[in-house]
């Protein structure tokens, strides 16, 4: 009967202690938090298609850009450093989890010493070996919450790694688009240089026959030289973009030739549609939102850890060993050393330190929740803005293409009329300026349209895959033959 009562009391005591275990600070999960912020639909209409946000850089129809982004994601040094930070957080979690388990240590000792204290024993020989086990039971859950906080930190660093990859893919694509824009700009200048050179030659020939004036020749020379003055700056921009891409890929600017991007190609043309996704889905996909929510989870667990400091802490120690001693020529004496100890400490007076620590962690959690809400608001703004830029950019490219055709036709007509003496050279100069302006405007519009698509995919959180729990996404070196 007594044994039954003892068991009942033991179970009741265990249940009581379990009920006293602290919990993380309460907070809504990520889907619920997103629902409080995300609208039901986007305010800007855009053509929708089954195009996805994963590996979006492959959807521009430019194999060189596709290959470059893959190389950068595999070889970038910042990505490799971020992978190491994830591993560090995982190791911290293992250390925190190890604190929940008992610790077992082995010890050995050997001594040979002279003892002169009464009674004099002469030289004493001692040797011993033993085991020591210790365990600090997590009765009130503080250590388990520390593990939870460490796991949230792992999640946050993994999301930060995804965010870095997404930003790096977008920055690489943007630099590649800038490079193609600069190369196209150089081609436009070269084409217009030929047009203005022919105009200068024409005015010089007409001057010989008295059909033109020195003023026309001077104006033609001025137009040509102004145009030629732009070439060094554009070539410098091309070199800057190539060097930037090389650094993104973990290479020195001198090795940029291995990336095979020095040959001019057209600006990549983005798809005319956007991925079908709801605002809530886009927010859940964005790595910066996940990083912010992981911070909320970490802060909530840290609140529980701070609250656990109010409760007692227990420690159980057990040791066992053998000690052998020999002195005065007597036979060796052995002794079995065994001890068990249970200790407990509980805070009584700390001048409000624990309460202040709890308040600090609760404030940090509220701060992280506000940061999460602000991150989601910024994300929604980014998506809406980039959707608008993509739609309007497509229309702008179409309009400017028509304007360039018209200015090209006007340039041909002005040259013919000038040759026939039906118009002045000022008309030719005006037509040249209009043609150059429209060509540069169309080139810039194509650049902005492609950049808007890159920004949209980045704002949608595309270009990364959520890893399995506890896994660090591997960073594989590229297999670029040219680089090797």
PLM regions with names:
Residues 111-115, 241, 321-325:
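Structural signature of outer-membrane beta-barrel domains
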Residues 3, 143, 159-278, 389, ...:
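Periplasmic alpha-helical coiled-coil/stalk elements that build and connect Gram-negative outer-membrane
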Residues 127-135, 175, 278, 338-342:
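Hydrophobic, lipid-facing positions within transmembrane beta-strands of outer-membrane proteins
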Residues 80-81, 97-98, 137-165, 215, ...:
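Sec/SRP-type N-terminal targeting helices
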Residues 207-211, 418-422, 459-463:
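A short glycine-centered flexible hinge/capping loop motif at secondary-structure junctions
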Residues 122-126, 333-337, 438:
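Transmembrane beta-barrel outer-membrane domains
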Residues 21-171, 313-318, 348-358:
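Short flexible linkers and secondary-structure junctions
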Residues 2-74, 151, 235-284, 290, ...:
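Terminal intrinsically disordered/low-complexity segments used for targeting and assembly
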């Amino acid at each position: 009967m007594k044994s039954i009562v003892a068991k009942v009391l033991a179970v009741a005591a265990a249940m009581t202690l379990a009920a006293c275990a602290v919990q993380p600070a309460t907070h809504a999960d990520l889907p619920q938090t997103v629902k409080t912020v995300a609208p039901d639909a986007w305010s800007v209409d855009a053509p929708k298609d089954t195009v996805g946000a994963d590996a979006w850089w492959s959807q521009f129809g430019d194999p060189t850009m596709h290959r470059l982004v893959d190389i950068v994601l595999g070889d970038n040094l910042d990505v490799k450093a971020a992978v190491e930070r994830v591993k560090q957080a995982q190791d911290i979690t293992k250390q925190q989890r190890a604190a929940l388990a008992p610790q077992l240590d082995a010890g050995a000792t050997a001594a040979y010493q002279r003892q002169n204290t009464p009674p004099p024993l002469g030289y004493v020989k001692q040797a011993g070996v033993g085991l020591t086990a210790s365990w600090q039971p997590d009765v009130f859950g503080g250590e388990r919450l520390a593990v939870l906080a460490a796991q949230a930190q792992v999640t946050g660093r993994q999301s930060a790694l995804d965010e870095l990859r997404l930003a790096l893919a977008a920055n690489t694509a943007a630099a590649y688009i800038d490079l193609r824009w600069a190369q196209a700009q150089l081609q436009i200048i070269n084409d217009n240089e030929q047009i203005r050179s022919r105009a200068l030659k024409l005015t010089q020939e007409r001057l010989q026959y008295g059909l033109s004036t020195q003023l026309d020749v001077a104006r033609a020379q001025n137009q040509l030289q102004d145009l030629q003055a732009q070439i060094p700056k554009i070539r410098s921009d091309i070199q800057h973009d190539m060097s930037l891409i090389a650094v993104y890929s973990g290479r020195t600017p001198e090795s940029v030739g291995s990336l095979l991007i020095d040959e001019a190609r057209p600006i990549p043309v983005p798809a005319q549609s956007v991925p079908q996704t709801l605002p809530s889905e886009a927010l859940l996909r964005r790595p910066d939102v996940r990083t912010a929510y992981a911070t909320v989870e970490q802060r909530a667990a840290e609140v529980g850890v701070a609250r656990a400091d109010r409760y007692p802490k227990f420690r159980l120690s057990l040791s066992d060993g053998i000690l052998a001693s020999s002195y005065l020529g007597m036979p060796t004496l052995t002794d079995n050393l065994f001890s068990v100890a249970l200790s407990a400490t509980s805070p009584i007076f700390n001048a409000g330190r624990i309460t202040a620590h709890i308040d600090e962690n609760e404030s940090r959690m509220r701060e992280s929740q506000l940061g999460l809400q602000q991150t989601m608001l910024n994300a929604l703004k980014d998506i809406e803005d980039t959707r608008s830029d993509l739609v309007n950019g497509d229309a702008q490219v179409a309009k400017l293409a028509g304007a360039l055709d018209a200015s090209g036709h006007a340039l041909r007509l002005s040259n013919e009329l000038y040759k026939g003496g039906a118009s002045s050279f000022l008309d030719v100069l005006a037509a040249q300026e209009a043609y150059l302006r429209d060509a540069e405007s169309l080139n810039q519009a194509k650049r902005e349209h492609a950049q808007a698509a890159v920004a949209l995919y980045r704002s949608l959180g595309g270009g990364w895959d959520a890893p399995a729990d506890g896994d660090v996404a591997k960073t594989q070196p590229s297999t670029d033959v040219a680089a090797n």
